[in-house]
Amino acid sequence: RAAAAAPQGRGAREAAQENTLPAFRLAREFGAEWVELDARRTADGVVVVHHDAQLADGRVLAELTVDELPEFIPSLAEALEECHGMGVNIEIKNLPSDPDYDADHLVSEAVAGLVQAYLGPERTIVSSFNIDTLDRLHAVDPTIPLAYLFAIGDPAMAIARACAHEMTAIHPYDPLVTASSVER
């Protein structure tokens, strides 16, 4: 059967800001079995949950320590603790075009450690548009399921790429999911 999912708490935007602890609490209260959240790394190496590379005031997360961030931005550890009992899709945000790009993919190592500490691989999938980031995570812990995100191109090519990199799934950008693409 299909699992109920609450991407980033978006189903209750008026009640809680997405990617926050209150949003994950609400997701549980609404009966979500899975949530999706976005992971980024700070200057001091802490993985935090935030969609954008920059804060509203323009400061880049990767140039700030966790203590310099607004209080509403949780660490990934705090978020995973809050999500206990639910499955979690952790999207690692790490594109070369992002101002917080982590060329060494250290975020992958940190995420792998947090998954093992808080949830385990059976209640987790880690996704990213950056295949190198996913490859690094797989090298650190091959038991964690991975999903390749893609926004353009032929889904068959994305499937082939995901298979070549030992990934569990593909996650296409919403507009790419049509009846005809699903049938293929």
Placement of each model-derived feature along the sequence:
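Phosphate-group recognition and catalysis centered on beta-loop-alpha active-site segments
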Residues: R1-R184
